[in-house]
Amino acid sequence: MSLGLVGRKCGMTRIFTEDGVSIPVTVVQVESNKVTQIKTTETDGYNAIQVTTGFKKRSNVNKPMAGHYAKASVEPGRGLWEFAIDNASDYEVGASIDATIFEAGQKVDVRGVSKGKGFQGGVKRHNFATQDATHGNSLSHRVHGSTGQNQTPGRVFKNKKMAGHLGSENVTIQSLEVVRVDAENGLLLLKGGIPGSVGGDVIVTPAVKS
């Protein structure tokens, strides 16, 4: 895994190229990511750096986490994230990582938590077809129908597509293009859409696929 950044989704807009082509982009605000811990094979069994970003009131931080931040001499952030990298020892606790690790034209992967839709039926959740609107059908227009067989096997198989909770899952969008890097304002402009609601945290890393 490569070094990445934790940012916050600001929403979508569009920018125009010099020849008038409109490009839809998602704006990701990247506040300074502070290194809170260096993990190595000798001490933790793997190499990684732990980072935090944002701000959290000290009154909302429990004592163990307050001690963790104090040990790193870093102000409490809104969470902790890790990036598994081979050269973790090249970084120091308290160091800052900003949007300049990316450049325009680079491909990145973006991970986030998809929008929660609550409990949904099979038509919306799994794109099932609806049943007949008329011809003797009553109250079953959007029912998913049979879920299994009869006495054998006498049960519903695991992973059967049925109604249930939709969204609020970890989703990765791969190979999005970095259209622009605004280091002064801490912004990344990524071509296309990314998972999650406005204000949600996203993790941006170099693309694993070219």
Curated annotation (Swiss-Prot):
It holds the Pfam family Ribosomal_L3. Methylated by PrmB. Keywords: Methylation, Ribonucleoprotein, Ribosomal protein, RNA-binding, rRNA-binding. Residues 133-152 are annotated as: Disordered. One of its GO terms (molecular function) is structural constituent of ribosome. GO terms for cellular component: cytosolic large ribosomal subunit. GO terms for biological process: translation. The modification N5-methylglutamine is found at Q151. InterPro entries: Ribosomal_uL3, Ribosomal_uL3_bac/org-type, Ribosomal_uL3_CS, Transl_B-barrel_sf. It comes from the Bacteria. PROSITE patterns: RIBOSOMAL_L3 (PS00474). One of the primary rRNA binding proteins, it binds directly near the 3'-end of the 23S rRNA, where it nucleates assembly of the 50S subunit. Part of the 50S ribosomal subunit. Forms a cluster with proteins L14 and L19. Belongs to the universal ribosomal protein uL3 family. This is Large ribosomal subunit protein uL3.
